[in-house]
Amino acid sequence: MLILSKLPKTWIIDIDGTIFEHNGYLKGKDRLLPGVKNFISKIPENDFILLITARTKENETRLKDELREFGIRFNQIIFGAPVGERILINDEKPSGLSTAIAVNVKRDSGLNIEINYSDAL
């Protein structure tokens, strides 16, 4: 479960193995993983969603079409990301609020993550 502040956020979400089946696009068409639509629907409209993928820019039109077809909203996509670790470094708020959170999910298991927003953070 994610317990988050009510401040606007930036969500950085990998595509393959997280939103769509890993390398599914190589078999023809992407397959949406369980819980993804529900998870994305719980992200407030004023939050920024940045998707990231190792897919090349040549896949842009097809990928954006499939995301829209499945109703997955996003603000921006980074293509051609390396396949290694993704590292986020951010400062901590003076209040002590951690502004960098990492969630690792098992490949192709979907996004069955509960989100709760707290006034206390």
Enumerate the predicted regions with their spans.
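HAD-like aspartate-dependent phosphatase fold
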Residues: M1-L121
